[in-house]
A protein has these predicted regions:
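Acidic-histidine catalytic/liganding microenvironments
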Residues: 39-40, 77-81
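Short, surface-exposed coil-to-beta transition loops
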Residues: 55-58, 86-87
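Conserved short beta-strand edge segments in small beta-sheet-based binding/regulatory domains
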Residues: 79-94
Length: 95
């Protein structure tokens, strides 16, 4: 079965201050997130900022792996940069 996982990212207050001072800070994290998805051999379908959401970023991938396997991706995303991610939440869409 194919899935689309949307991982919504709320960044920390410290990260938000850095992001507001320099928009490249967020862009750099998104570029690294793209590399994480590529490393896990998943198809990137969405990368950016969700509209009208509490979270600042969203990473969307299309894959046939289970949610447990996708957890390895989110773990790597959490560890891109210390103190960047406050929390992440996943939305699953089955195809």
């Amino acid at each position: 079965m194919k899935y689309v996982y949307l991982w919504y990212v709320k960044i920390t207050h410290t990260a938000m201050k850095k992001y507001l001072a320099d928009s490249n800070y967020g862009s750099n994290w998104l570029a690294k997130a793209k590399e994480v998805v590529k490393k896990h051999d998943m198809k990137l379908v969405l990368l950016g900022s969700p509209f009208a959401a509490v979270e600042q970023f969203v990473v969307g991938v299309e894959t046939d792996v289970s949610l447990d396997e996708f957890g390895k991706v989110t773990s790597d995303l959490y560890h891109i940069e210390p103190e960047f991610v406050e929390y992440g939440k996943t939305m699953i869409i089955t195809q």
